[in-house]
Amino acid sequence: GDYIIEIDGDIIMHSHFIQDHISEARQGYFLVGSRSKINEKLSCRLLQEGNYQLSFLTKGVYRKFNALRLPWISSLFHSYKQNKKERGCNISFWKKDLLEVNGYDERFIGYGFEDIDLPARLRRLGIKKRFIKFKAIEYHIHHKAAATKKDMSTNEKIFNENNQKGIIKCPKGIEQYIT
């Protein structure tokens, strides 16, 4: 497809998640949504029972403000949090824009900073951020952190280097697989 919606593997999407991203997609923009979180007890129960009906009222959901779906006021927040670093757990963009920045920088090890590097390079390309608050709701399942401090330190150095040099197209990305 021409449009990519990206999530993490440890989230539960609201039933309108995909529809919300598609309805907000505009040329020249990438979209960023927020996420609510699920505590450990509720996460275990959901994974055992397989019943994923959640809302901001569900006991065990926190960051409840991020679990509110209010599409009629979402557009008021499109330019909200313009300076905040994005995360890759709830982001969408045009495939052509992803290819122009050479996708994710594969010099990153594990996770950490790779998902803020991509949107930073999209911005340097001239693609603007649109925040989709109160739409594209997702719930992050509780788990222990997997990244090591060494990986995070290495990744932070790569991210800072990309920023300092104004890198738009990363040196090791998706092109190596499609050329």
Where are the model-predicted features located?
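Conserved donor NDP-sugar-binding/catalytic core segment of glycosyltransferases
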Residues: 16-53
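Acidic metal-phosphate-binding loop of nucleotide-sugar-dependent transferases
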Residues: 10-12
